[in-house]
């Protein structure tokens, strides 16, 4: 089933290639389909290992899957080769910047607000150390400091949540930022060779009566 999964995702890559040719621009998430496919399947040995297991379990299914992968790879390569100039100029950096910069700015703003509240709370705590707990000033500051602390804790929780999201998006962006379409082309060439080799091997085994 691993090869079928690859084929399904390659078909989505092919669809987006055609869209890119037409529009010359894709969303951040659509661009991630390209880099995600490459990073998830660049270990080509995993395809070979999956094929070897499938050959023992169900060679007929493997043959069907290999043919589907070979066809999808052929479509990719035909599209790539006929529009190579467009794909050579592929540059995901602007869309990455448009995606990540606002998130970075949002996190910095929330983190700064939280730090200012903590600073204010710390200053009030220091001031309270020099006051008599029975004084009205102390009680007033104590009440205010509790309110400031509560606001800080809420802002800090918001800051932590924003940071987790920002970090996750930054990791996605890092994989895409310097991605080049040629990486995908080289990977698909290797995938097609493997798929065609699987087809040939199964046909030979059939002719020899071994399966």
Question: Model-derived features: where do they sit?
Answer:
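Leu/Val/Ala/Ile-rich N-terminal alpha-helices, chiefly Sec-type signal peptides and the beginnings
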Residues: 1-70
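Long amphipathic all-alpha helical oligomerization modules
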Residues: 137-211
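Extended low-polarity, hydrophobic cluster-rich segments
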Residues: 6-14, 33, 44, 69-76, ...
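Amphipathic alpha-helical coiled-coil segments
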Residues: 44-57, 76-79, 83, 106-114, ...
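Long, compositionally biased alpha-helical segments
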Residues: 29, 75-78, 201
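Short, charge/polar-rich alpha-helical segments
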Residues: 89-122
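Short, charge-rich amphipathic alpha-helices with coiled-coil/heptad character
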Residues: 51, 58, 69, 73-102
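Short helix-loop boundary/capping segments
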Residues: 125, 129, 133-136
């Amino acid at each position: 089933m691993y090869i079928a999964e690859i084929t399904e995702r390659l078909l989505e890559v092919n669809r987006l290639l055609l869209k890119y040719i037409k529009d010359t621009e894709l969303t951040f998430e659509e661009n991630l389909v390209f880099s995600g496919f490459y990073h998830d399947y660049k270990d080509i040995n995993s395809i070979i290992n999956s094929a070897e297991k499938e050959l023992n379990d169900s060679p007929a299914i493997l043959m069907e899957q290999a043919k589907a992968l070979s066809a999808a790879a052929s479509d990719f390569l035909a599209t790539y080769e006929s529009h190579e100039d467009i794909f050579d100029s592929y540059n995901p950096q602007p869309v990455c910047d448009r995606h990540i910069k606002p998130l970075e700015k949002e996190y910095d703003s929330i983190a700064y607000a939280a730090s200012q509240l903590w600073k204010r709370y710390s200053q009030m705590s220091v001031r309270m150390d020099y006051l008599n707990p029975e004084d009205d000033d102390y009680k007033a500051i104590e009440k205010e400091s509790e309110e400031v602390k509560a606001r800080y804790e809420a802002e800090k929780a918001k800051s932590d949540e924003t940071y987790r999201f920002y970090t996750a998006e930054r990791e996605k962006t890092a994989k895409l930022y310097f991605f080049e379409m040629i990486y995908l082309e080289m990977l698909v060439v290797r995938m097609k060779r493997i798929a065609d080799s699987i087809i040939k091997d199964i046909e030979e085994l059939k002719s020899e009566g071994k399966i």
